[in-house]
Amino acid sequence: MTKARDVMTKDATCVQEGQTLADAARLMRDLDVGALPICGDDNRLKGMVTDRDIVVRCIAEGGDPTSTGVMTLAQGKPVTIGADDDITVALRTMSEHQVRRLPVIDGHDLVGMISQADIARNLPDESIGDLVEAISR
């Protein structure tokens, strides 16, 4: 049984809850990622922000990413997975919520991120197509 902690990207970089969408966009560019966890001063997960959120929900609506806080786009409780959950649980969670990445939580602490690609690298070749299809619906 492969666990989320075995395939996740450790030490996920957070954008802080007081930062702007422009700060988040620069951090995404620098890290070459499409999503970032939003963390509070206690380094606990407060939400998620994606490059698509910034474009569609801020810029396309006439918003100013240099003055709009990241928490403006955080919606509800973020979907997460436990560090000791099996990757099949991660896959099912991604499929149910139509997301490609999940924050990995151990207790209340953010310990990493797991992506569709992380899971695909650890699946038999014949299962990869099923993964992509399930998440892309």
Identify what each model region corresponds to.
Residues 14-32, 39, 81-98, 105, ...:
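The conserved cystathionine-beta-synthase
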Residues 28-31, 36-52, 94, 102-117:
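A glycine-centered beta-loop-beta connector
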Residues 64, 99-102:
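Residues in soluble alpha-helical coiled-coils and helical-bundle/repeat scaffolds
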